[in-house]
Amino acid sequence: MSDLENFVPTANIKVIGVGGGGNNSVETMIQAGIQGVEFIVANTDIQALQRSSAPNFIHLGENKRGLGAGANPEVGKKAAEESIVEIKEKLKGADMVIITSGMGGGTGTGASPIIAKIARELGALTISIVTTPFEFEGNLRNKNAQEGIKNLRAVSDSIIIISNNKLLEQYGDAPMKDSFLFADTILKHTVKTITDIIAIPAHINLDFADVKTVMKDKGDALIGIGRASGKDRAVKAAIHAISSPIIETSIQGASHTIINITGSANLTLTEVHSAVNVIKNAVGPEMNTIFGATINESIGDEIYVSVIATGLSSSKKFNSEQEIKDEVSSMLKTMEIDLQASETKTILINDPLPKDEKMVLTSLLDRDSKILEKDDSQDDTLPFFLKRNV
């Protein structure tokens, strides 16, 4: 039986993409067939809204000429303030609102905090998932992004920040245009991890109340996704998840985690326990954990482990991939793990995330590249020199 046949809506979840980057991310999610959510796009740019497949849209601002925010966050903020009645109407009835946007431009940076504040006032669990600019995009754009994140953090229950610079470290050899699709793919996976936990029936089930416990009033959060196959696959996938290329900082010290383990019918309870135990050891003894396990026959011998960690300090410094790997290696040296193969621990200590085990982005990118054949000339998240028709 497919996930779609199994799908049972249990909470009213709305995903709203704000600005050019947010609109693009929502389009990726729609085309990927994410189930159990209502999609909304919001923009000051009417052309961007007309290109979207989302069933619901909000044209921000009283000025309906629809010319965009000109990369000015104040314009985006004012436009959202002028559209409060419509925003409230579109978000009404939601149990959870997920806001996705690119920080640094005008609409996403300025309007997202206004929308998050409204969602929270309406009683919805409010989660913001945002991207930050590449360093080469300049000081002003990066400064705007940091100010936007500060404003968004103050009005969100949880915020997950995905750094384009971090993606550049990992996938810098990819064509430049594809770098933005990597970010969209990760945003899609982040939203899907959250919504699947709530909406897809599982053998070890989680629901909206579980997600609310972990994410309400928790501030900074992160997501890690790992995969592995063969002997000790659960342990390896868990280690890969906490060493994930998209993790901005160490998972150590998080107050709460959601762990979701996906495997085929041969997934065992011992493997589930092993994966959860690895992450509990990495985070620390004070962590509160909830976990679920889902069967998906399409992934064959692989196991996927997704972890969302919340309650991280906003002052915690960002770490490079090597710094995170070094920390995981050090932790592994003293961790007691039941393993099928004696060499597994040594292999993981030497390299917690081998290149061939990194999250499967490249294969997904081929599909998403076909999905997002769009006109980027109005996308306020793209650097000027990457836009078409200029």
Swiss-Prot record:
GO terms for molecular function: GTP binding; GTPase activity. GTP binds at residues 20-24, 106-108, 137, 141, 184. Its main location: cytoplasm. Keywords: Cell cycle, Cell division, Cytoplasm, GTP-binding, Nucleotide-binding, Septation. GO terms for cellular component: cell division site; cytoplasm. Disulfide bonds: none annotated. The keyword Cytoplasm applies. Essential cell division protein that forms a contractile ring structure (Z ring) at the future cell division site. The regulation of the ring assembly controls the timing and the location of cell division. One of the functions of the FtsZ ring is to recruit other cell division proteins to the septum to produce a new cell wall between the dividing cells. Binds GTP and shows GTPase activity. HAMAP family: FtsZ (MF_00909). This is Cell division protein FtsZ. It comes from Mycoplasmopsis pulmonis (strain UAB CTIP) (Mycoplasma pulmonis). The lineage of its organism: Bacteria, Bacillati, Mycoplasmatota, Mycoplasmoidales, Metamycoplasmataceae.
